[in-house]
Amino acid sequence: MWRLALGGVFLAAAQACVFCRLPAHDLSGRLARLCSQMEARQKECGASPDFSAFALDEVSMNKVTEKTHRVLRVMEIKEAVSSLPSYWSWLRKTKLPEYTREALCPPACRGSTTLYNCSTCKGTEVSCWPRKRCFPGSQDLWEAKILLLSIFGAFLLLGVLSLLVESHHLQAKSGL
């Protein structure tokens, strides 16, 4: 009975972006087989990954698929799925946001890029993120120009003031 329910979970999980690319790896099928072999570990397999909040470019999707392939290969060799929930969590909290940022920020993104929705595997053309969102602590070119001009102006003013003080000092000295 639980195998039937487990099959439904894998059909839903098959739409996650981890399973969108590189069909030769057959990740969803391998994951289903691995979990069906480990009947006692039903709890670890039952947790379906939720990647609906993410969209990745093709290169990032291939990286995630390759990484998942390697993780599943280790689990198949060890015949253990206990680390599967922590892998899904790490992927969702660490790698997918990192890959999304890489795909939408310079230098990888120039103007627009095609991202694939992680819940539907459908590609959509999207605009790149603004530089301030990609690099929140950095300044854009206009702000850098203003900063440089301000510093230049301050040094110029200090130079003129220094010249005036020195000139008055020399006039006072020659007048004595």
UniProtKB/Swiss-Prot annotation:
Disulfide bonds join 17-118, 20-121, 105-128, 109-134. The chain crosses the membrane at residues 146-166. It is a single-pass type I membrane protein. N-glycosylated. GO terms for biological process: fusion of sperm to egg plasma membrane involved in single fertilization. Spermatozoa (at protein level). Residues 1-16 form the signal peptide. Changing residue 70 to A: Significant loss of sperm-binding to hamster egg membrane. It holds the Pfam family TMEM95. Sperm protein required for fusion of sperm with the egg membrane during fertilization. Does not interact with sperm-egg fusion proteins IZUMO1 or IZUMO1R/JUNO. This is Sperm-egg fusion protein TMEM95. It comes from Homo sapiens (Human). The gene is TMEM95.
